[in-house]
C-alpha cells in the first residue's frame, strides 16, 4: 500500500523510528541495520515500507533500501518466520551477509541468530536459496561471499588459538562492522585479538 515514506526523522530508537510526513507521525519498525544508516533527528530521510495488516493491528516496517525490504518479504514468506524473526535476522546480519549465507547454504550462520533453530534454518535455505540466487541479489552475493570467507577463516583461526566460538564471533563481527567488511584475514585476526 505504501512504497516509501519521505519525511523528517522525529524519534530514533534501535527498534523503531517516528517520521513526520506532512504533519502526520508514522511509527516504523526498523532493523539495527536500517537504524545504523539513519541520520540524526530532525533530518529528512526516506524509508521504504512494508505494511503488515492483522486483525488487531496495522504495523509499518521501514527499510533503508529496497533490497532489505525485498529480503524481509522473502523471509516472512517462509512458514514459521514472522515479522519479528525477520527483523531479528536483518538486525543480526547485513542484507548482503544474510543473502550470501542463504545462497551458500550456511545453516550454522542462520542458527547463530537468536530465535532461529535448526528446522527453521533448513526451511529458510530450502525455500529461499533458489529465489535469492535467481534474483537481483546475486551481484551483492558475490561481493559478500569474499567477506564471509574472510570472516570464516578468521573465526577458524581464533578458535584454533583457544578462544570460544561465541566470543570469537562477537569480536570478528564487531571488527567486520567497523571496517565495513573491507579487511584482510590477517588484519581481522589481529584486530580481534586486541578485543579478546
Tell where the protein language model's regions lie, with residue ranges.
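Low-complexity, acidic/Ser/Thr- and charged residue-rich accessory regions of DNA metabolism proteins
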Residues: 101, 137-196
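Amphipathic, charged-and-aliphatic alpha-helical interface segments
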Residues: 58-63, 83-102, 123-136
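Conserved NTP-handling cores and scaffolds of large molecular machines
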Residues: 49, 79, 97, 132-136, ...
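Structure-specific DNA junction-binding interface
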Residues: 1-77, 182-196
Amino acid at each position: 500500500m505504501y512504497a516509501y515514506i519521505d519525511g523528517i526523522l522525529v524519534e530514533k530508537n534501535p527498534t523503531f523510528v517516528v517520521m513526520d510526513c506532512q504533519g502526520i507521525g508514522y511509527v516504523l519498525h526498523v532493523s539495527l541495520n536500517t537504524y545504523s544508516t539513519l541520520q540524526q533527528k530532525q533530518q529528512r530521510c526516506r524509508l521504504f515500507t512494508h505494511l503488515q495488516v492483522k486483525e488487531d493491528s496495522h504495523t509499518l516496517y521501514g527499510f533503508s533500501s529496497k533490497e532489505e525490504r525485498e529480503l524481509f518479504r522473502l523471509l516472512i514468506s517462509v512458514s514459521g518466520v514472522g515479522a519479528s524473526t525477520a527483523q531479528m535476522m536483518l538486525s543480526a546480519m547485513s542484507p548482503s551477509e544474510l543473502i550470501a549465507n542463504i545462497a551458500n547454504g550456511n545453516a550454522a550462520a542462520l542458527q547463530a541468530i537468536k530465535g532461529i533453530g535448526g528446522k527453521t534454518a533448513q526451511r529458510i535455505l530450502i525455500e529461499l536459496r533458489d529465489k535469492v540466487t535467481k534474483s537481483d541479489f546475486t551481484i551483492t552475493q558475490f561481493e559478500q561471499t569474499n567477506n564471509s570467507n574472510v570472516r570464516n577463516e578468521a573465526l577458524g583461526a581464533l578458535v584454533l588459538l583457544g578462544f570460544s566460538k561465541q566470543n570469537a564471533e562477537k569480536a570478528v563481527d564487531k571488527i567486520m562492522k567497523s571496517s565495513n567488511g573491507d579487511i584482510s584475514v590477517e588484519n581481522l585476526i589481529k584486530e580481534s585479538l586486541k578485543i579478546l
